[in-house]
Regions:
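Accessory interdomain/linker segments of ATP-dependent helicases and helicase-like nucleic-acid enzymes
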Residues: 36-118, 122
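Short aromatic-glycine-enriched beta-strand elements
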Residues: 130-135
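Short nucleic-acid-contacting surface segments enriched for D/E, G, S/T with interspersed K/R
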Residues: 149-166
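Short, charged beta-turn/beta-strand-edge "cap" motif at the junction between a beta-strand
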Residues: 166-176, 183-184
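C-terminal effector modules of nucleic-acid-centric enzymes and ribosome-associated factors
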Residues: 180-183, 193-241
Length: 241
């Protein structure tokens, strides 16, 4: 299993945090452009999913300007809730195709960042408050750093929870730093259908090599994990409210 230095150098953490804040605000603003058509889609399932995420069902991270940029969730919808062969090119792909060679430097940068998006399942290992969370990427089977200021205050070491999310890499590749795409969906122990429970067992115990998914398999895995996470959150809300 690959390891990470856990950003021991304070100067490195300062650089990573500044880049995280810049890039997060930039992607949130730009992605809003592709979220709007989804809200008015003729596809009922897509429209319902877009409204559910857009209206804040998932936990949101606050920004310095006081806004919650719900539109980031389009990156998650791309893999978790869209079937591209039925709906057409995904919003992420449309953005990349439209702005990948744009004269607008910011739009071009966002398109480049989006092109490296990937879905995964994370297990938190250790929190560094005010910066982020050291996690095990269960699909890549390696440690990584999730730069997440808000999350760093709430994760509990050894809690055993698994989170489904999308990741965007940034900064020096050797740092193995990522930011999530706006939602960390919890998969708690109290609600795990057999298929996902077995998936987690396979990832954590029996596999000795990283799990490699074909492009057409990623949406299936993401859809299962996110459906499970959404239903689990709903169950928790019903049970404990």
């Amino acid at each position: 299993m690959a390891s990470t230095s856990w950003m021991k150098n304070k100067d490195d953490r300062t650089v990573a945090l500044a880049e995280y804040q810049r890039l997060r605000a930039l992607t949130a603003r730009e992605v809003a452009e592709v979220m709007q058509p989804m809200l008015g889609s003729d596809n009922a399932a897509l429209k319902s999913a877009a409204h559910r995420l857009y209206n804040g069902v998932t936990p949101r991270e606050g920004y310095e300007d006081g806004e919650n940029h719900e539109a980031e969730n389009t990156l998650i919808l791309d893999y978790a809730l869209l079937l591209n062969d039925r709906v057409g090119p995904s919003p992420r792909r449309q953005y990349i195709d439209k702005y990948g060679a744009s004269d607008d430097a910011e739009k071009r940068e966002v398109a480049e960042v989006m092109s490296h998006y990937r879905f995964t399942l994370l297990r938190p290992v250790r929190s560094r408050k005010g910066f982020g969370v050291k996690c095990v990427d269960l699909l890549a089977q390696q440690e990584m750093v999730l730069v997440d200021v808000a999350g760093s205050e709430h994760f509990h070491e050894g809690c055993g929870e698994v989170y489904a999310t999308g990741l965007l890499p940034f900064c020096d590749p050797s740092w193995n730093c990522f930011m999530d795409t706006g939602a960390l969906m919890t998969i708690p122990d109290i609600f795990r259908p057999n298929d996902v429970a077995q998936l987690l067992v396979d990832l954590e115990v029996t596999r000795r090599q990283p799990l490699v998914l074909a492009e057409n398999e990623q949406p299936k895995l993401a859809a299962v994990a996110f459906k499970l996470a959404y239903e689990a959150q709903t169950l928790c809300q019903m049970r404990y409210r």
